[in-house]
């Protein structure tokens, strides 16, 4: 075999998927899990390689959420939820915790206008007495996909064409035509709320399902929701074009100027909880990030308030070097087996190490404000002053000991390791319900945006037909209206 014949080039692409080392990949859609809903296994080398490779594609700009603005403030507990969690920073009403928050757009570059139709990031870093807690979410409560295996592909489809560097609807429509679970997210993105007026007037959500654990060790699934006290306001197309044309940094400036003027943005934090023992009663999977939890069944419970009362001192140090990761939690809060969350746990820290270096948590914006100690030494850009002689554990010469044990979810797992989809997909019910909740004029604007994306000349008749079928399954009249405007026959 000529070792140079198949040098790295797209001219020598294999007809099937492989790893970087050339091994065949038989499933490029699902992660390797314990059973259909269990945790993802680290031995899924293809997943790890795929995510690790993806995390290193751009430097030094964030691969997503590149365009952002930050501010500092505090979180104050207003309601007692100690029956649900033993988290120290939630121990009693009145307790305040310093925070730094970063808002962002998701897909577009660092200098792009803040008036583009795009999800918005809403990430909060709590500097607690028991270490940092990063609640890394968006302004929408759902996401496009439910398995992180598809995250690199999803972002690639939303990013500009690699040949022309132009974002094109035909690529987006093609990719998501393979993923009907994305419909719910599109009912948010293509709705009137798809372009927030600014960062102060938008909701926030933890998006993923986490777990709360109380002192007795009882666990509850939890969703986090931020609600702005000044209300939600959005821009329609004409307004967005006008504002973005005049100032491509209007949301950043609005946030900065409002805080400087003493008009401090504020959000209320609410949670929804589900007893894991009762999840089988639902017609959806509570660990499915493409679903919301009905508020009439799982009401919003108030927790506290977030106030941003101080602008950052340096954009590079407290925005570009500010790094979040869903893996950073505190006692009383834990992960769930949400497949997207499980992959975010790895991917976020990995991309920060790539972007900022292995010691990114030593940077002032990312470092905990409480005492901390471990044997993680040296590495690139290590600037922590250390004079210990003991860099191992245990030792009779160093009094450092284990921390007191705290409760974690008491979960037993069994199942066949496999790459598979969840059992309760139920992709169309919630998108249909959300569409029917819109007023007639709001429905019309939504339909116009859907049709606009599908009207790209390179969107094939096959892809249009698939989308008409999807929207028809969500709501028959919606599918008929889209089909009529696209001249596509509905296929029920």
Swiss-Prot record:
Catalytic activity: 2 H2O2 = O2 + 2 H2O
EC numbers on record: 1.11.1.6
Active site: 65, 138
Gene3D superfamilies noted in UniProt: Catalase core domain
Compartments where located: Cytoplasm, Cytosol; Peroxisome matrix
A biological process term (GO) from this entry: hydrogen peroxide catabolic process
Keyword Metal-binding attributed: yes
Any GO CC annotation of this UniProt entry: cytosol
Keyword Lipid metabolism: no
Residues involved in heme binding: 348
Entry keyword set: Cytoplasm, Heme, Hydrogen peroxide, Iron, Metal-binding, Oxidoreductase, Peroxidase, Peroxisome
SUPFAM superfamilies linked to this entry: Heme-dependent catalase-like
Main location: cytoplasm
Membership in a protein family: Belongs to the catalase family.
UniProt name for this protein: Catalase
Listed cofactors: heme
Free-text function comment from the UniProt entry: Catalyzes the degradation of hydrogen peroxide (H(2)O(2)) generated by peroxisomal oxidases to water and oxygen, thereby protecting cells from the toxic effects of hydrogen peroxide.
GO MF term set: catalase activity; heme binding; metal ion binding
Organism name: Helianthus annuus (Common sunflower)
CDD domains cross-referenced by the UniProt entry: catalase_clade_1
InterPro entries membership: Catalase, Catalase_AS, Catalase_clade1/3, Catalase_core, Catalase_haem_BS, Catalase_immune_responsive, Catalase_sf
Subunit architecture: Homotetramer.
């Amino acid at each position: 075999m000529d070792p140079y014949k198949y040098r790295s080039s797209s001219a020598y692409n294999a007809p099937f998927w492989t790893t970087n080392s050339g091994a065949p990949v038989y499933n490029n859609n699902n992660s390797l899990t314990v059973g259909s809903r269990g945790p993802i296994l680290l031995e899924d080398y293809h997943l790890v390689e795929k995510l690790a490779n993806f995390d290193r594609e751009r430097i030094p700009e964030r691969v997503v959420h590149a365009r952002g603005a930050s501010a500092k403030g505090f979180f104050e507990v207003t309601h007692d939820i100690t029956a649900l969690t033993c988290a120290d920073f939630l121990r009693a009403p009145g307790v305040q915790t310093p925070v730094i928050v970063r808002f962002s757009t998701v897909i577009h570059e660092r200098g792009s206008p803040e008036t583009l139709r795009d999800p918005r990031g809403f990430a909060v870093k709590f500097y607690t007495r028991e270490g940092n807690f990063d609640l890394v979410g968006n302004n929408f409560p759902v996401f496009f996909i439910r398995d992180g295996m598809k995250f690199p592909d999803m972002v690639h489809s939303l990013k500009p064409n690699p040949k022309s560097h132009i974002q094109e609807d035909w690529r987006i429509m093609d990719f998501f035509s393979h993923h009907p679970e994305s419909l719910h997210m599109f009912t948010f993105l293509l709705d009137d709320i798809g372009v927030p007026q600014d960062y102060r007037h938008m909701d926030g959500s933890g998006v993923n399902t986490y777990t709360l654990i109380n002192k007795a060790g009882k666990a509850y699934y939890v969703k986090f929701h931020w609600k702005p006290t000044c209300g939600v306001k959005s821009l329609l197309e004409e307004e967005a074009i006008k504002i973005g044309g005049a100032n491509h940094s209007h949301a950043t400036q609005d946030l900065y100027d409002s805080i400087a003027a003493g008009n401090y943005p504020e959000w209320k934090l609410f949670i929804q909880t589900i007893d894991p023992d009762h999840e089988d009663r639902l017609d959806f999977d509570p660990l499915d990030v493409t679903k919301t939890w009905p508020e009439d069944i799982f009401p919003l419970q108030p927790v506290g308030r977030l106030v941003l009362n101080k602008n950052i001192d340096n954009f590079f140090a407290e925005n570009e070097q500010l790094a979040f990761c869903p893996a950073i939690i505190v006692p009383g809060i834990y992960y769930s087996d949400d497949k997207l969350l499980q992959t975010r746990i790895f991917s976020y820290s990995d991309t920060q190490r790539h972007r900022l270096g292995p010691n990114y948590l030593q940077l002032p914006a990312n470092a905990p404000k409480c005492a901390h100690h471990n044997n993680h030494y040296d590495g690139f850009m290590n600037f922590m002053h250390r004079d210990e002689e003991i860099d191992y554990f245990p030792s009779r010469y160093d009094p450092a000991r284990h921390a007191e044990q705290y409760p974690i979810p008491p979960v037993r797992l069994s199942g066949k390791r496999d790459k598979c989809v969840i059992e309760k997909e139920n992709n169309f019910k919630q998108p249909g319900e959300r569409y029917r909740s819109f007023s007639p004029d709001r429905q019309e604007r939504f339909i116009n945006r859907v049709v606009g994306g599908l009207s790209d000349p390179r969107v094939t008749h096959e892809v249009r037909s698939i989308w008409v079928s999807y929207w028809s399954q969500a709501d028959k009249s919606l599918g008929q209206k889209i089909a009529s405007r696209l001249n596509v026959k509905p296929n029920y």
